[in-house]
Amino acid sequence: MSVNVKDFGAIGDGIADDSPAIQKALDSGSTIVEIPEGNYRIVTTLKVSSFTRIEAAKNARIFSCGDTPKHQGDLLLTNSDFERGNTQISICGGIWDGNNTGKFNTKNPDLFAPDAWSGTVLNFFNVANLVLEDFVIANSVVYYARFGKINNFVIHNIGFQSDFPGFNQDGLHFSGYCRNGLIENVSALTKGQTNDDMLALNADDSMERLENRGLLRGPIENLTFRNVFAEDCYTAIRMLSVTAPIRNIRFENIRCGCRNYAINMDAARYCRTPLFDAKDYPKGVGDISNIVIDGMEVWKTSERDVPLIVNETNSENIIVRNFRRVMERDKCPEVPTIVTQNTIPLATSFRNELFQ
């Protein structure tokens, strides 16, 4: 059974507040909710229940109103039940727009302000059998999409675009208890995006920061990423572990120009909000294991003097195959490709040459 949001009063003119009408459609009990072409201004967070599929037209733009103040918990769209969880939520199509030029769509300079909103466009927490496909996430204030406690999920054919760079503009941000997922065909559509980690696997993080409230520290495991492209992102991949494990992760066909890192495993040592005091961990931190990176082409797009791969995390069984640094495109060829420090001996196998 399908319904159309316009049958519930949605206008799609970019002026009317369409959030009540779209929410009525989502709450109607229909398994498919259709959003036709148009510009849908969203004032209050859209909440999606279990057994719901949103089918949005390719040019349906669903955007966050910039004229209303934002508070903790405000998002463009999220699942409905964080406590008991949701299952079988699908979103296909559309442009999901954080509208980062809106008057009130800004990041609070106080990272710990009690009522500050996260600045995230799409949020999924405690969801099983999630499918996200064939859409664009645009103009995020902070994260484009964030995930916590999700299991058995598929994300494919997702693009990121933004007219302006933003602080901590992660692409797909995974926190604790994300398990058993396939993520494929992910592209930055705008040069310069994403303006932070394109793929962030943060098993540990500062959960007191406004971006991360409501997420959890915990294991991240059994994920496959393939076909990831960015012309000029900040960092392609971050794996952040202090005590929580990241394990059984596979990356295939990653092709990214990077201003900062291609792979960042620095355990957030240099972050504004560090997660530990190094003096308390004389043998280092981290628990990363069974990582395969097969088919990666990267190049530096800035002259920043940092390696493409930085490892300062205890880890084992990291296998890198078919890695190529594209020197003819590299703006800082003199910097090392990889630096490892502050760890116990690392079991890493590099297969094929780093430089081709």
Which residue stretches match the model-derived regions?
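Extracellular/periplasmic carbohydrate-active domains that bind, remodel
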Residues: 1-356
